[in-house]
Amino acid sequence: MRSRPTDHARRAIGFGWLVLATVALIVPGAGARQARHYALESVEGLRLHNVTAQPATLQGKKGLRVTISDEAFRRLQGMTPAEQAQVQQLALIEGVDFTNGVIQAEIAGVPAPGAPEGARGFVGIAFRLQSDLKTYDAFYLRPTNGRADDQERRNHAAQYISHPDWPWSRLRQETPSRYEAYVDLVPDVWTKIKIDVRADHARLYVHDQEQPTLVVNDVKTGAQGRGAVALWLDRGTVAHFRNLTVEPSTAK
């Protein structure tokens, strides 16, 4: 005859199940890695490339104000438009190796004083950035397009690019509307964005929306692409960034 467990044994078994349940709650899901948060209230931890950055307050929230550097601006003056397009303005987040995962931030952009007529306040996030600081994927916004009277401009409010081979101009010419989308935007106003990357699929979410603003099913760096994360802006933009979170994942 099998003996019945004592009260002490039953309590021990119950405690064991409690421990297992607690561990299940606190251990991250398969493939998850530690999320890294950057307040972006200083330039600490950033590598500046053709930009200047300084702490600033916008709409009562602290962040970084980022613009093209004076030196880079002077160099652009002697270049052709094609050459200018190859000059990138980036603030690299040091120590990040990103393949798949989620990137979130609050960003704002407005055309800089004296910017060309075509300036839109371009501002965004680059990912899988290579050491040459020229090869990367990115999602960015055109804030002045968000409420433009021209519907075509509205349709170009959000953009995916992959430099150097797939700039916005080539993507728009060869596959109109596939890598651009409408989203309501206001210049120089904090805008929450989330970029979710899985292999060669990426989605851009704006304003905490449950559904993506822009879906890309053929990320140009491919399923195995990897590299750094950087704050991204166009040379004619006054950009602000704050509250950046990078959460890499091994899941595909």
Which residue stretches match the model-derived regions?
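Bacterial N-terminal signal peptides
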Residues: G14-I26
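Sec/Tat signal peptide C-region and signal peptidase I cleavage site
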Residues: G29-G31
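Extracellular glycan-recognition regions
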Residues: R33-K252
